[in-house]
């Protein structure tokens, strides 16, 4: 695991230079915002979900992002087919279990994705990760939830079971893999007032994972960059509407030097 400031910064540089193609099967609520975020950071998004074409699309992509935000049977089939193709090609698959505790249908879909596919990175909020880990967490809507009794244990349990990097995002972000944890403290409270920020972050993690084989470094780098963009946007915003526009501008314009100066990371071992 290489979490030096220089290594994390280089991943951002590589995203902008290589412009990776990120195939995102996301929800219809946030698809435009997700694509805009990827485009602003320098990646090339493609939002295809038709079962008839996902194999072809994944074959030309550098990473695959699966989002459970607005699930239906055909979309789940497309996710599974795309995931199998990505696995066969060695492309990283990133999974966002949006609202997994809200219904039995979502929970069963998430479990099938985790059992049938080799997932590289899972990103969710506290309730979502708690639900996947079987440790509870009271859901109060898609984006707000109480924490599971032991957040670190929940993330560690899920990471051990799936062999994936697990990212738990909220007021304080946690990334867990291989007995180690990284706390990321970049971000701003205004980010919680804008719909779809989690979906955008998961897609951004996909862009970073497309150019960085160290998946915990890719995840930490993307989360820190996203949080720093939120900090910059908050300086110019007057409310959620202006924040949304300022955030996209910050994703586009945040420099490697600003990224280096602003990182707020703490590493720790999981007992």
List PLM regions with ranges.
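Acidic-glycine-rich active-site phosphate/pyrophosphate-binding loop
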Residues: 4-15, 164-186, 258-260
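Short pre-catalytic strand/loop immediately N-terminal to key active-site residues, enriched for Gly-Thr
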Residues: 156, 184-195
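Conserved phosphate/ATP/ADP-binding segment of small-molecule kinases
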Residues: 106-181
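Charged C-terminal helix
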Residues: 6, 228-271
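Active-site cofactor/substrate anionic-group-binding motifs, chiefly glycine-
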Residues: 37-90, 95
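Short, small-residue alpha-helix embedded
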Residues: 131, 195-224
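Glycine/small-residue-rich loop that forms an oxyanion/phosphate-binding "nest" at active or ligand-binding sites
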Residues: 75-124
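Glycine-rich phosphate/adenosyl-contacting loop at the front of the ribokinase-like
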Residues: 1-44
